[in-house]
Design a protein with these regions (language model features):
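Small-residue-biased structural context
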Residues: 1-183
Length: 183
């Protein structure tokens, strides 16, 4: 399997871990508890700054290359392109709502929770669609030259949470992950 696809699969594993963590925070929020808003905001900042700026653009390059090779699953790739945009928008909206709560803005709890649940649901569907449909197709159809070209064009950045940690920027998230690493 191409190294780039290995990296994307690892990113998905890490993101799934964050989605589970976000879901636990939302479950507590639903029960009337105060979630760790700083933790939730850091998770969303990570998604905005790594997934939206590095991970998704890399996947988009793979999708474009696949479309040059074949029309097979074009509809799925078009859905994934749209989902990248929608996920970015939902993430930003949810983060703004959480920051509003932190700054004591008057927001309905149920609507804030609904934003979070919608983001989680779409993100999980998105990961399943990529891993179940498009990544196997990429393994099958893309050549070594395709992978080299994608690698050259892909944005480069070290994962600030699961790679070379930016402990100052993502302190709360990093500390939480280190405390729950074996879960």
């Amino acid at each position: 399997m191409p190294k780039l696809l290995d990296k994307l699969n690892l990113d998905h594993k890490h993101l799934s871990r964050l989605l589970d963590l976000m879901e636990k925070q939302l479950d507590g929020f639903h029960e009337g508890n105060e979630p760790d808003f700083e933790l939730m905001c850091e998770m969303l900042e990570y998604v905005e700054n790594y997934a939206d700026q590095v991970h998704h653009p890399t996947e988009d390059l793979i999708f474009h290359r696949l479309l040059e090779r074949s029309d097979e699953r074009r509809d799925v790739m078009e859905t994934l392109f749209e989902q990248h945009q929608t996920l970015s928008r939902l993430s930003k909206q949810f983060r703004q709502s959480l920051e509003g709560v932190v700054h004591e803005a008057v927001l309905r709890r149920d609507l804030v929770e609904q934003q979070g649940r919608e983001l989680l649901k779409l993100q999980r569907q998105h990961l399943d669609l990529e891993e179940g449909s498009i990544f196997p197709l990429a393994r099958e159809l893309l050549t070594d030259d395709d992978w080299e070209r994608i690698q050259e064009e892909a944005p480069t950045s070290i994962d600030p949470v699961f790679g070379e940690q930016d402990q100052a920027r993502f302190r709360t998230l990093y500390q939480h992950l280190m405390g729950t690493w074996d879960e």
